[in-house]
């Protein structure tokens, strides 16, 4: 069974662990850089991207994650953290050649749920202060999902990033299955 790490310093950690179990993988909560050893993939969860970024700097995660050669899934704040820029000064991994519009849909009260397409399937997406891709910076970035023309899912190399929270909907498992099939098991 594949071991999927979930960055466990802030955000929706338990919900991601439950989803990883549903796709017959072993979740491993990542609290220190040493916990990165032995994982087959990494999930960077939603939460507050500035807080997660500062904690990643404090705990020494930035360079360690940048040097990983494994698939990475970023959800919501995870998408923000993987990006090249947000227009705001904050720690970023800068691994995904996109810029991000933070909180593109507005504040917490503007959060919503909507059906969108991902990998040829319809998924009930939960958008909570969700980002959108502002600009794609290289030709190897592929669009995975859109919401009314706005880019909310991309992939580049071994990285998948989505602006919604798959861990919060019953059929969100579709996103994890897509990640598993197209990234983790793609050898």
Curated annotation (Swiss-Prot):
Keyword Transcription regulation in annotation: no
Molecular-function GO term, any one: pyridoxal 5'-phosphate synthase (glutamine hydrolysing) activity
A Gene Ontology biological process term: pyridoxal phosphate biosynthetic process
Gene3D superfamilies found in the cross-reference section: 3.40.50.880
Active site as annotated: 76 (nucleophile), 165 (charge relay system), 167 (charge relay system)
The enzyme's E.C. designation: 4.3.3.6, 3.5.1.2
CDD domains registered for this protein in UniProt: GATase1_PB (cd01749)
Superkingdom, natural source: Archaea
Gene Ontology cellular component terms for the protein in this record: cytosol; glutaminase complex
A Pfam family this chain is assigned to: SNO
Subunit structure: In the presence of PdxS, forms a dodecamer of heterodimers. Only shows activity in the heterodimer.
PANTHER family membership: PYRIDOXAL 5'-PHOSPHATE SYNTHASE SUBUNIT SNO, PYRIDOXAL 5'-PHOSPHATE SYNTHASE SUBUNIT SNO1-RELATED
Family in the record: Belongs to the glutaminase PdxT/SNO family.
Protein name: Pyridoxal 5'-phosphate synthase subunit PdxT
Organism, scientific name: Methanococcus maripaludis (strain C6 / ATCC BAA-1332)
